[in-house]
Amino acid sequence: MPDASTFSRKAVLVTGASAGIGWETALAFAGKGASVVVTARRENRLRELCDLIVARGGKAVYFAGDAADEATAYQCVALAIKKFSRLDILINNAGAGNYKNLIDTSAEEYDSLMDSNMKSSFLFTRHAVPVMIQQNGGEILFISSVAGLQGYPGEAVYCATKVAQIGFAQALDGELRKHGIKVGTICPGGVKTEFALGKGRTAASVQHSHMLEPKEVAEAILFACSQPANSRILQMTVRHMGEPGR
């Protein structure tokens, strides 16, 4: 496992950082020495997160915006360069959930979910990659889902967005490996976040379930990003002990 100085010379950009997995991932990287750029739409939450990181002796800055807006992606990468002179790791975590049958899903809802989960991943990666190529290396992780590995009834559009992330990452691995850039996906099962609500699940039932804590997923993300230079993790599935493997 990474120690307190593993990422001391690294600058990390985390999208969807105002809660859940993104929040815990930013805290975890900062706790291991990384300089962190965080982004999401809720500015008050980002400010709270950065204040917490700084209070613990870390370095963090934020940019509030919609991850599906290209200007947000551009500004976040530029902020990393301005404040930390580099960008080493991109965690594409921004996203949304949807638990609806196909016949209850509108075209507008399809577009919104695809924008949140896939377009945001494309935009941030598109703006981060030139920086990483210039640096002769970097790492990009997509926080997908077990819903990207198999289809679940009542989640067709959500599954489609997560399958898209995995395919995108697999293609990029082939494109970017020659530049020293590692690309992979993390596929969590059930996690105690706001996106777990639905299909009869309430906030209380989620909190009392055996679902993964966001912090546990963050630990898997840091593990994937702390591999030796000559090895990479292409895909990692993380499930809680009460969840079947398939």
Regions found by a protein language model. Give the residues of each.
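Residue(s) in the substrate-gating loop at a strand-loop-helix junction
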Residues: S145
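Active-site helix of classical SDR
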Residues: T125, T161
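Substrate-binding pocket helix/loop in short-chain dehydrogenase/reductase
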Residues: N101-L102, E109-M114
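Conserved glycine-rich Rossmann-like NAD(P)H-binding loop of the short-chain dehydrogenase/reductase
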Residues: K32-L49
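C-terminal helical subdomain
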Residues: I181, T185-I186, T193, S205-R246
